[in-house]
């Protein structure tokens, strides 16, 4: 409602189709400053106007990632590539060079479900590739926090199947914090036949309690493996090559305080 009101009263937003699409622009641009201002005002309304109501949004203009160029996986979602051994700015693999670029936000689309119509992180994404995203998160103390994480944001108008037990999605996405793999929650929807009459359960991260994770005092490594096979699959009609990852309070009400997200360990 607030986002629609912003556009209705203040205009703007043409970059969704005509510019960067789903990707936040660099911090020194007017478009970023406008979004950061909107985010600040929206979070004020969350704390005051809508206090006590579910409001599944936390600050994300401080969340920074490094994302690699995508490696061809030949349809093998488990295939291991150089970023899993060592983080670098440039990778050389099978005679090709793969770079790293920065992105900002708690939720990143590598490829939008509408394909070329809406720009996303990759200008020309291909099927059967694997990307990696990582950042370092500075915590001022040892603490237990909540984790919002998902790799397929389920559309409630679809009759998609929930992931299989122990899997984040049907693409093979994985997440590690300080080298320890974080497993998905127990999915509440277990049906195997798609039907509009069967509601989804806790597939989306904001529709469930955050996962409890521990952050060490100092820098914590967050590492994501993001494979993609075909852009169409039987289990989910809209294949979303994306991720959401951000730390929140254990109750999920607010962003975890005092954290610095920096892929270069810059405070």
PLM ranges: what are they?
Residues 141-147, 155, 216-219:
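Short tyrosine-centred short linear motifs in exposed loops/low-complexity segments
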Residues 2-60:
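Flexible, acidic glycine-rich loops studded with aromatic residues
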Residues 36-128, 156, 187, 221, ...:
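Accessory carbohydrate-binding/adhesion or oligomerization-edge regions at the termini
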Residues 127-131, 138-148:
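Extended extracellular/luminal ectodomain segments enriched in beta-structured repeat modules
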Residues 66, 136-138, 212-214:
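Generic structural detector for well-ordered beta-strands
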Residues 160-161, 166-243:
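Beta-strand-rich ligand-recognition modules
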Residues 135-141, 151-155, 228-230:
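Beta-strand elements of well-folded, non-transmembrane domains
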Residues 118-131, 197-206:
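Extracellular beta-rich ligand/substrate-recognition surface
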């Amino acid at each position: 409602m607030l986002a629609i009101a912003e556009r209705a009263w203040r205009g703007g937003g043409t970059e969704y189709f005509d510019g960067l699409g789903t990707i936040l622009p660099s911090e020194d641009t007017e478009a970023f400053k406008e979004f950061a201002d909107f985010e600040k005002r929206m979070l004020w309304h969350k704390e005051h106007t809508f206090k006590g109501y579910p409001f599944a949004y936390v600050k994300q203009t401080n969340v920074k990632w490094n994302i690699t160029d995508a490696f061809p996986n030949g349809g093998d979602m488990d295939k291991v590539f150089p970023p899993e051994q060592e983080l670098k700015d440039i990778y050389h693999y099978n005679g090709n060079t793969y770079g790293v670029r920065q992105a900002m936000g708690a939720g990143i689309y590598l490829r939008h479900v509408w394909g070329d119509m809406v720009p996303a992180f990759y200008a020309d994404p291909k099927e059967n590739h694997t990307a990696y995203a990582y950042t370092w998160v500075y915590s001022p103390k040892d603490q237990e926090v909540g984790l919002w994480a998902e790799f397929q944001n389920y559309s409630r108008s679809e009759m998609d199947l929930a992931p299989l037990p122990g899997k984040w999605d049907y693409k093979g996405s994985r997440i590690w914090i300080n080298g320890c793999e974080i497993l998905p929650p127990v999915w509440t929807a277990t049906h195997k036949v798609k039907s509009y009459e069967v509601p989804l359960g806790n597939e989306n991260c904001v529709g469930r309690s955050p996962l409890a994770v521990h952050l060490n005092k100092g820098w914590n490594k967050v590492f994501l493996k993001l494979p993609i096979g075909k852009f169409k699959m039987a289990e989910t009609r809209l294949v979303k090559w994306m991720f959401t990852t951000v730390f929140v309070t254990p109750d999920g009400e607010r962003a975890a305080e005092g954290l610095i997200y920096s892929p270069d360990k810059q405070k």
